[in-house]
Amino acid sequence: MTDRAMSYPRILADVGGTNVRFAMETAPMRIGEITAYKVAEHASLEAAMRLYMLTRSGAARPRHAAIGLANPVTGDQVKLTNHNWAFSVEAMRRALDLDTLVAINDFTSLALALPYLPDASLVQVRDGTAVATAPRALIGPGTGLGVSGLIPAPGGAVALAGEGGHIEIMPVTDDEWIAWRAAHDQFGRVSAERLLSGMGLSHIHAALSAEMGTPLEVPLAPAQVTDGAMRAGDPVCRRAFDAFCGMLGSVAADVALVLGARGGVYLGGGIVPRFVDALRASTFAERFVAKGRMGSFLADVPVYVITAEYPALPGLARALADRLEADARRAETSQS
């Protein structure tokens, strides 16, 4: 195992639909030099990473990097779902003169980060007692809807890589049905992400406005809907917000049931941390256990909101360390 193979610093990049956040890991889990760029302001991820490498203060050249992407990562070729960036992981590694470039789904990296998040960055919004040896579920509305889980396994926990945000969603209340039907008329199939995301919150509000006979020429931005619900006392914004929280409770419970997540459910993404108190006061917790015969299974499952500003970065560091250790073991085996 060479010094270069395990060297620091290492670049970490968390790529969302709106922003890309770069950081430098200078020692195990020592993460700093965090810089955020707007995705729309850069022609490619490679260009954004080059800019970050040019502007960082450290003298040592990074040899290894990990990127988390709000996108399925199933091979070398990557095309972002919510932006026009597309690239080959291997070609970008060579272009940036890196020894290692790991690409994983952003919610896979966030799941890997769960054991490293301090208690101060977690706000419990539903009572319960986590079972330390049980799976944990992760769901997060943002530009899209991320879903993952952390599953205990021999040798360390395994983070799931999937696209659970695109499962079907089942409305319950009248307002939810109004939003669902409007989405169905527009898109055909209605995934959970269509309603449980930033664009989903805007869509719910627009659908309710149209149902009331006051269609909008331009939908409100998600922040406008939440502001209208919590501060301005707008009744349509309030109904949209309530529908959003109720459906989030239902879908979070579905993910918990699939994974057997007695280790807790974690809410990430860029939306929910903005209204933690309002989520507590909503129907989220009620809908979380409204699962018929399985309500008793969910009754003691705690739910936490992740409030850390850059929560996925420790998970990227973990994924990169795991890859380097695996590569080193393979190299040692081939030489023996």
Curated annotation (Swiss-Prot):
Location(s) in or outside the cell: Cytoplasm
Binding site for ATP: A13, D14, V15, G16, G17, T18
UniProt GO MF annotations: ATP binding; D-glucose binding; glucokinase activity
GO biological process: glycolytic process
UniProt keyword Nucleotide-binding, yes or no: yes
Top-rank taxon: Bacteria
The enzyme's E.C. designation: 2.7.1.2
Catalytic reaction equation(s): D-glucose + ATP = D-glucose 6-phosphate + ADP + H(+)
InterPro entries: ATPase_NBD (IPR043129), Bacterial_glucokinase (IPR050201), Glucokinase (IPR003836)
UniProt-listed CDD domains: ASKHA_NBD_GLK
Keywords: ATP-binding, Cytoplasm, Glycolysis, Kinase, Nucleotide-binding, Plasmid, Transferase
Enzyme class: transferase
Signal peptide extent: none
Predominant location: cytoplasm
A Gene Ontology term for the protein's cellular component: cytosol
Family: Belongs to the bacterial glucokinase family.
Protein's recorded name: Glucokinase
UniProt organism field: Cupriavidus metallidurans (strain ATCC 43123 / DSM 2839 / NBRC 102507 / CH34) (Ralstonia metallidurans)
Gene name of this polypeptide: glk
